[in-house]
Regions:
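Carbohydrate-interacting regions of secretory-pathway proteins
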Residues: 19-226
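Bacterial N-terminal signal peptides
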Residues: 9-17
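Hydrophobic alpha-helical segments
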Residues: 8-9, 69
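Bacterial N-terminal signal peptides that target proteins for export
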Residues: 1-8
Length: 226
């Protein structure tokens, strides 16, 4: 019986290894613009202008496909990454973002899928150039916020920019078009909040549709694990 079990364990390990190698091979063969393509900086593309690997929760009509990515406009809704690379812990995220004037959006990290409501898990990094909320793009929402004067000449409405989030250990850095706008270190022993967790752990990524007056585009989503 032990010999039989050992043989089964070895066979299972071989199959798992084959599956992993097949996935790695498929990823290495992915062309630019295809999910799984790895660029020269080691980032893996996880969005290709379709819904593959993504799941919208409530108010699904708030989302559409446009300009090679996701377009958000409508009642509160969130679009979660559900692909095979999740969960993420220490990692980098790059997203190309474009906002219409007076628009509000958000990018969540270390979060988890939920059917409705504002995501409880993880942190939100704000997307907002000119909408009324004083917390602007690059803010770690209600934790360490960025004001408008820090974004002058960095990002503008109606123009694509790169939103780059780096998570290593207890530190979050946010770069907009290559400029560091936020550098936050989570204090040891930080407790989860009541209304929102606002605490590092691990999880997935989500994009926000904030309200019917806000139009935000998200595309070319790529990640690199550390």
């Amino acid at each position: 019986m032990k010999t039989h079990r050992s043989a089964l364990i070895v066979a299972a390990a071989i199959l798992a290894g084959c599956a992993s190698n097949a996935a790695d091979s498929a990823q290495s063969k992915a062309k630019p613009g295809q999910i799984g393509h790895v660029d020269s900086e080691g980032f893996t593309l996880i969005s290709d202008g379709t819904w593959t690997g993504w799941k919208v929760n409530e108010s699904q009509n708030s989302w559409s496909l446009s300009e090679g990515g996701f377009r958000a406009q409508g009642e509160r809704s969130h679009n979660f990454y559900t692909g095979p690379l999740a969960p993420f812990k220490d990692f980098e995220l790059k997203v190309d973002v474009k906002t219409a004037p007076n628009s509000n959006g958000g990018i969540y990290i270390h979060t988890k899928y939920q059917d409705s409501g504002w995501p409880w898990g993880g942190y939100e990094t704000q997307v907002n150039q000119t909408q009324g909320d004083w917390r602007k793009s690059g803010s770690i929402y209600s934790v360490q916020d960025v004001k408008a004067d820090k974004l002058e000449g960095v990002v503008r409405d109606n123009e694509w920019y790169t939103h780059h989030v780096v998570v290593k250990g207890n530190r979050i850095q946010i770069f907009l078009n290559g400029k560091l706008v936020n550098d936050f270190t989570e204090e040891p022993g930080r407790k989860a909040g009541k209304d929102f967790e606002r605490k590092l752990s691990e999880g997935t990524i989500a994009f926000q549709a904030h309200d019917p007056k806000s139009v935000v585009h998200y595309r070319n989503v790529r990640v690199k694990k550390h």
